Amino acid sequence: MTESHDTPITPDGEARPHRRIKSFVMRAGRMTEGQQRGLDQGGPLYILPLADSPVDYDQVFGRSAPRTLEIGFGMGHSLLEMAAAAPEQDFIGVEVHRPGVGALLNGVLTQGLKNLRVYDCDAIEVLNRCVADNSLDRLMLFFPDPWHKARHHKRRIVQLEFAELVRRKLKPGGVFHMATDWEPYAEYMLEVMSAAPGYRNRAADGTYVPRPEERPITKFERRGERLGHGVWDLKFEKVD
């Protein structure tokens, strides 16, 4: 859900101060014991503060390694699985849903992972303020809110402005990997990314890539497959 540039108008016709639409929608949720443990014990160790200048992630992780950032990891199952399967890589997750952050950190504590850190704030702020240009090997955006209604399309996170922000943060050859289970949104993302300068579609036919093995299948996705629902993956590589 990207920034909106609409200026609300008051009943007397005066413009209100601009309110930026953030990259997320807050949803309430009860905290389980495990999720609370994750926040209480894992938060001080693995949640990174929002910085005012680019972060030296080599220092954060204590090494130089391929680096992936995921926006909106939900309950964290896929990100946790990917980090556990690739200990030679470093992962950064961004999520504002507190139960999801707690669930991921509980898993990090349980598995003893050292290659994963979290931001619990707006992803746009994280990219703009914390992530240096040309520093990410991969950025993942899986199953973002499609904002089905036409009047809400401006809230979709995948826009040309966002694509340019991601391109700046990726290293040359870095990949922006998106996935959605709603075909109209897949078509929309393909249209936006095909028009975004500085990218090359990794799909041989210029559309969607086969489901990559490195992206874990979620329970939601398995249920959708049983019901005949599709999932569309897009991979765009930074070329300059």
UniProtKB/Swiss-Prot annotation:
Source domain of life is Bacteria
Q: Which SUPFAM superfamilies match?
A: S-adenosyl-L-methionine-dependent methyltransferases (SSF53335)
What is the E.C. number?
2.1.1.33
Q: Which GO terms describe its molecular function?
A: tRNA (guanine(46)-N7)-methyltransferase activity
Q: Which positions does UniProt annotate for S-adenosyl-L-methionine binding?
A: 70, 95, 122, 145
The family database entries (NCBIfam families) matched by this protein are listed as: tRNA (guanosine(46)-N7)-methyltransferase TrmB
Q: Which PANTHER family match?
A: 3-DEOXY-D-MANNO-OCTULOSONIC-ACID TRANSFERASE/TRNA GUANINE-N 7 - -METHYLTRANSFERASE, PENTACOTRIPEPTIDE-REPEAT REGION OF PRORP DOMAIN-CONTAINING PROTEIN
Write out the function statement from the record.
Answer: Catalyzes the formation of N(7)-methylguanine at position 46 (m7G46) in tRNA.
List the protein's name.
Answer: tRNA (guanine-N(7)-)-methyltransferase
